[in-house]
Amino acid sequence: MRDSRVTEQRNPRTADIDLASALDIVDIIAAEDRRVPDAVFGQREVLAKAIEAAESTFRRGGRLIYIGAGTSGRLGVLDASEMPPTFGTDPEMVQGIIAGGPAALTRSQEGAEDTIENAVSDLDACGLRADDLVIGIAASGTTPY
């Protein structure tokens, strides 16, 4: 059975990228990257609501907690780790949790994302409070973790 999620499908625009010249590879990647602003623009209302939710969370003393698996989790941890040096925030204000724990930052932890119970346990371990905002990051939108 073939996985129908868009994140698990081949991109027809990059199907033969491995056969392309270096310059053509750059052109293919640049063409795909140019699609991002339109995608962001199409979700601007949803993104604005997320920003407003984060602002409200911070104003009442809550934390922003990213949670995700694999690359999605790594990006959450990366963003959280950049907040103190970039914006001077307390390291507790924005946190990142990745399925499989710190080891998953450098090596794949297969199966760590497969149960919601792992996510609940990790959120409990960080001392999740009612005033916190949790943002789950998943490319497919279907990862249990």
PLM feature spans:
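Short secondary-structure boundary/capping elements
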Residues: 17-21, 46, 111-118
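Short glycine/serine/threonine-rich phosphate/pyrophosphate-binding segments
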Residues: 72-78, 130, 137-145
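Glycine-rich oxoanion-binding loops at beta->alpha junctions
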Residues: 82-134
